[in-house]
Amino acid sequence: MGDFGMSGDDLEQMYQEVILEAARDPHGREHFATDVSKEQGSAPADTTVRASHEYCTPGESHQFNPTCGDEATVHAEVSDSEPHTIERLVWDGHGCSISQASLSVMVDLCAGKTVDEAMELFRDFHELMESRGAGLQDEAKEEKLEDAVVFQGVSKYPMRIKC
């Protein structure tokens, strides 16, 4: 099952298509105003906010990979009422095609989901990235990951996982 029902060549072709699509039309990418975090009531842009979803507020996470220079800021807004839906999910940044494509796929996958659903997707994606190319061995999880499953190939290269 770890190949999402595809041959290695099919998965590689799908990977290339997802990367190229994200390069042409990166979903959720916005150029942030320098003070967007203050306007939205969240932490400064150079701060990573880490809070469990029980404290639903707008938040940002800024990440920098010093080994390759990838840099991204993700801004999320979550509804105050149950079931705490991700109402807005945008990002800005620069880096390699893998980092840019993964941000674009994340927006497609998580926007509009509940925080609990997004956290489940995060756990499944994290498991995929730790698989060293073997995949999840669970077709239902792979189907939920949609286009994100193409990053299975990246999991073969530990230095690229942070991308």
Please annotate each region the language model reported.
Residues 9, 62-63, 92-96, 108-111:
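Short, surface-exposed loop/turn motifs that are enriched in glycine and acidic residues
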Residues 74, 98-100, 117:
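Basic, gly/Ser/Thr/Pro-rich low-complexity segments located predominantly at protein N termini
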Residues 98-103, 163:
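Catalytic-loop motifs flanking and including active-site residues across diverse enzymes
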Residues 55-56, 84-88, 106, 139-146:
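Glycine-rich, flexible loop segments associated with nucleotide phosphate handling
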Residues 1-52, 113-163:
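C-terminal binding/interaction regions
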Residues 13, 17, 66-70, 96, ...:
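Alpha-helix initiation and capping sites
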Residues 25-93:
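Structured beta-strand/loop patches that form or line metal/cofactor-binding pockets in enzymes
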Residues 102-115:
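Alpha-helical support elements that line or immediately flank enzyme active sites
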